């Protein structure tokens, strides 16, 4: 119902913008978005892609191999993050070869945490200041982004790779992100995401030997 309401409002806004506003050029976040809008609304104006560069500095990586962990940034109060984490908790985490610690950052109410029925070594840090968040970013093996819904470029993924942190995500969430640090499979199946995380853990943990 939440997504349906957003969908209806977004469609109404898009039609108004495209029909009433006279512009010389449309700028899109991803190639997929550009092609979709050109086809749906028969856009004849010039269309281009926005730069996906964020003004964030690389951080010094000091990976904690003694107590390794993965990082999932993003408040679960945001519907898309909750949906993705729920999928990860139920379908992905139980099938990993190594039961590794996972830290979820961002606002998280006790109600939402209980709804997730989290098992295993999955912990919630709550909201963090920049210094503490960057400490986790520096120490983690990498970022996991179990995102399966939403539109546009996923800022948390873009921010992570530009900080120099590897990210394992879904094919869906990788759209618009061109980085050697962004790892994903050929589809959005559970088995593919599980395989990508397992492969990443095997590669990364072997570096500590």
Features from the language model and the residues they span:
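Conserved catalytic-core segment of nucleotide-activated headgroup transferases in glycan assembly
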Residues: 28, 48-131, 138
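Short alpha-helical segment that forms part of, or immediately flanks, the ligand-binding pocket
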Residues: 134, 155-162, 175-176
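Helix-loop-beta element that forms the nucleotide-linked donor phosphate-binding surface
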Residues: 18-29, 34-54
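Short acidic alpha-helix that forms the nucleotide-activated donor recognition element
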Residues: 19, 129-141, 162
């Amino acid at each position: 119902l939440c997504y349906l309401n957003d969908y209806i409002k977004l469609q109404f806004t898009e039609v108004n913008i495209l029909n009433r506003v006279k512009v010389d050029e449309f700028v899109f976040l991803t190639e997929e978005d550009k092609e979709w809008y050109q086809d749906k609304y028969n856009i004849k104006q010039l269309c281009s892609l926005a730069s996906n560069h964020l003004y964030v500095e690389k951080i010094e990586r000091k990976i904690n191999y003694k107590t390794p962990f993965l990082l999932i940034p993003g408040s679960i109060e945001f519907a898309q993050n909750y949906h993705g984490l729920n999928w990860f908790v139920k379908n992905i985490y139980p099938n990993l070869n190594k039961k590794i610690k996972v830290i979820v950052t961002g606002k998280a109410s006790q109600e939402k945490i209980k709804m997730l029925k989290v098992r295993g070594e999955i912990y919630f840090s709550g909201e963090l200041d920049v210094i503490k968040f960057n400490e986790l970013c520096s120490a983690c093996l990498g970022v996991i982004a179990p995102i399966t819904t939403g539109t546009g470029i996923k800022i948390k993924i873009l921010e992570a790779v530009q900080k120099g942190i590897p990210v394992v995500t879904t094919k869906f969430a990788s759209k618009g992100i061109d980085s050697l640090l962004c790892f994903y499979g050929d589809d959005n199946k559970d088995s593919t995401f599980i395989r990508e995380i397992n492969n990443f853990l095997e590669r990364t943990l072997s570096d500590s030997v």
